[in-house]
Amino acid sequence: EKSYTFNNLAYGYYLVYQTGTKEIQSSLVSVDKDSKTITLKGKAPSIEKEADKTTVEIGQVVTYTITGTIPDTTGYAQYTYKIHDTLTEGLDFVEDTMGKLPTEKKYEVSVQIEGEQDSVIKEADIDPDNARKITLDLSQWIRENQTHKGNTFTVTYYAKVNADAVVQTNNSAHLEYGNDPDNITTTTPDVVTTPTYPVQIHKLIKDQQNS
């Protein structure tokens, strides 16, 4: 919890406004004595992750959706908002539902604000040491969309199940945010688990088929 002190205020009414949270928090406070304490409770930024399939097979493409809320950055000279995503060895990032592999160290994802008809394409950075890790920096996008503060948004992207998939394929995402570069908050990873079932192939000998 953070606390702030304001000194030498004249008596009267003050609008106290909390920023940096995913929900706008404010309170009209009357100052009518020398000392007064108020408490504002805001929800810290967070993300949730979902997959469009409950079970998958090798070769299938899974659509992942991350949902977040545009935080209020009023009064901040800078604000960091980065989404980190890590796949297991049984998944590979792909560009579409057809399973096209990325060709560059940039990976395109779709970002859409709730209630808006159009989405925008943003580029995530692929970790040079691990092609199954990406970082999506939405810091500038968050600042540019303060007219939508408090609204939810979604990030959509795809991953293909490969031959290294085990019984369960895990995919985790976490958020990195804050207005102080030296004191950035990292959320607990949100893990999506998708059971994987191998494709069973039975070979039939021609003579057995005719018998």
Regions found by a protein language model. Give the residues of each.
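Short, surface-exposed beta-strand/beta-hairpin micro-motifs centered on an aromatic residue
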Residues: 2-8
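Serine/threonine-enriched low-complexity regions used as flexible
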Residues: 8-31, 66, 79, 140, ...
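Extracellular beta-sheet/turn segments enriched in Thr/Pro/Gly and aliphatic residues
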Residues: 22-23, 30-49
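A short, amphipathic beta-strand motif
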Residues: 49, 85, 199-206
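Short, solvent-exposed loop/linker segments at the N-terminal edge
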Residues: 54-60, 193
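A surface/secretory-pathway sequence property marking extracellular, secreted
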Residues: 81-135
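Short, ordered, surface-exposed loop/turn motifs in non-cytosolic proteins
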Residues: 208-211
